[in-house]
């Protein structure tokens, strides 16, 4: 009841995931194995977390606005005095930091308009450790849940700067030397297309557009990158 009251009246919501625990061996401390690989559950001795906080900042006449922040990271399990960015196991990043609104798009009262660091909805099957294609999580703007035919359309424009590796004389890549390229990507999801009972279809797509500087073009022309 308290949680529902805070969510409905104050507009604050929390969701997330974290893991922690204790392990030991008869010969030194436990060692992680195949971190991030398929089927590695139980072999990662770390405290990974994924926490999302949201706060409603506007609510009037069917129009709402909400600020959302998502933190991803890891907390080391080996000692109690480690700090982030000290070269150890402690890691932290802001995966999301954006404002999302509903009711502000004329003629589309249920469509979400967002701006900031965010990406279109992503899917994964936790128990199978299977992850689908993920859009870029970078600064951008997007629309979600646009009614279109029998389904709904999501579309976003995101920034995705890339680092091009230098080209060796034999054509192989030399990633010790890189060239930054500003890139924008257009992502779309056409989802919730009904097929049969409890089954639907989703189409995903992406188009990248490089915004090359004169140096980028010269390096490409000279086959340096």
Region spans (language model):
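Beta-barrel outer-membrane channel/assembly domains of diderm bacteria
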Residues: 1-108, 113, 146
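Long, hydrophobic, well-ordered secondary-structure blocks that form the structural core
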Residues: 114-135, 162
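Outer-membrane beta-barrel domain signature
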Residues: 3, 38-42, 80-90, 126-132, ...
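Extracellular beta-strand-rich solenoid/capping regions of secreted or surface-exposed proteins
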Residues: 92-95, 133-137
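Signature for the C-terminal beta-barrel architecture of outer-membrane proteins
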Residues: 132-133, 140-225
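Short acidic, gly/pro-rich beta-turn/loop elements at beta-sheet edges
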Residues: 26-28, 61-63, 79-81, 109, ...
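Transmembrane beta-strands of outer-membrane beta-barrel pores
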Residues: 20-26, 57, 71-77, 117-121, ...
């Amino acid at each position: 009841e308290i949680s529902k009251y805070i969510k409905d009246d104050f507009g604050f919501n929390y969701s997330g995931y974290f893991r922690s625990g204790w392990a030991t061996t008869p010969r030194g401390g436990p060692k992680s194995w195949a971190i991030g690989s398929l089927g590695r559950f139980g072999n990662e001795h770390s405290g990974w977390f994924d926490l999302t906080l949201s706060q409603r900042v506007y609510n009037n006449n069917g129009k709402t606005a909400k600020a959302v922040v998502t933190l991803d990271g890891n907390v080391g399990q080996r000692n109690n005095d480690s700090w982030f960015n000290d070269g150890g196991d402690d890691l932290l990043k802001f995966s999301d930091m954006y404002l999302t609104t509903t009711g502000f798009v004329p003629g589309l009262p249920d469509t979400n308009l967002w701006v900031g660091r965010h990406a279109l909805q992503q899917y994964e099957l936790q128990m199978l450790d299977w992850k689908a294609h993920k859009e870029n999580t970078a600064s951008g703007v997007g629309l979600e849940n646009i009614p279109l035919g029998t389904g709904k359309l999501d579309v976003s424009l995101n920034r995705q700067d890339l680092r091009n590796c230098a080209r060796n004389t034999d054509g192989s890549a030399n990633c010790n030397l890189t060239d930054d390229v500003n890139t924008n990507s257009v992502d779309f999801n056409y989802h919730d297309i009904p097929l049969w009972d409890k089954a639907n279809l989703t189409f995903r797509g992406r188009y990248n557009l490089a915004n090359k500087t004169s140096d980028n073009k010269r390096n490409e022309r000279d086959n340096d990158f």
